[in-house]
Amino acid sequence: MHAAVTDRLALEAAIRRGLERDEFRVVYQPIVALERGVLLGVEALVRWEHPTRGAVTPAAFVPVAEEAGLIQPLGRWVLEQACRQGAAWAAAARAAGELPFSVTVNVSARQIEDAGFVDEVRDILERSGFPADHLVLELTESTVMRHPELARQRLAALKALGLRLALDDFGTGYSALSHLRRFPIDVLKIDKSFVDDVAAGGEPAALVE
């Protein structure tokens, strides 16, 4: 128990130093329409190359950042990087006579619940020059259902900025299905377990009907 606590505190301190020393980076995963082979957009993913630990997986550091209250500065940094890069890509696309593609950025429950998050997003969009309608903020079903009414208000305010909203892992909490229409979601990513259960005629199939 003591060793686990010590390791967690050490990782938390390392995350703080990593933010100060620019050890994090953003990589972009293509989102492609397979039937047409067309690039629809990219998803911004955070990576951490620690000077002594080496590559630290998001599964290892993101939960610690969440618990330590570090996900807000980390998430802000990722959003800033993604919007700056997105603005550069959009300018290049326009110069080539092509349509800009979207950039998707994941946001956490703590970011959504932060009273200053909407203003933060607005400020980043304005400073970066990235068109709001090409930004997609992605959150999970569990994030919106943690505090549904607060999430609904925050998402409505974010939508008013002109960006799009995506819901990931939908179907992991079936009770939320009837509440989906309350949220201004543009893109729905359905969890594979939900699809499998629908095909098998389980409880989700009845909910879909």
Language-model-detected regions and their locations in the chain:
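Structural preference for long, well-ordered alpha-helical segments in enzyme cores
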Residues: 11-14, 18, 44-45, 64-65, ...
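Active-site core of bacterial EAL-family cyclic-dinucleotide phosphodiesterase domains
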Residues: 2-64, 92-93, 101-109, 138, ...
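Conserved long alpha-helical elements within nucleotide-processing catalytic cores of c-di-GMP signaling
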Residues: 59-63, 72, 156, 178, ...
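Helix C-cap/alpha-to-beta connector motif
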Residues: 73, 77-107, 123-134, 161
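The catalytic core of metal-dependent phosphodiesterases that act on cyclic dinucleotides
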Residues: 41, 122-198, 202
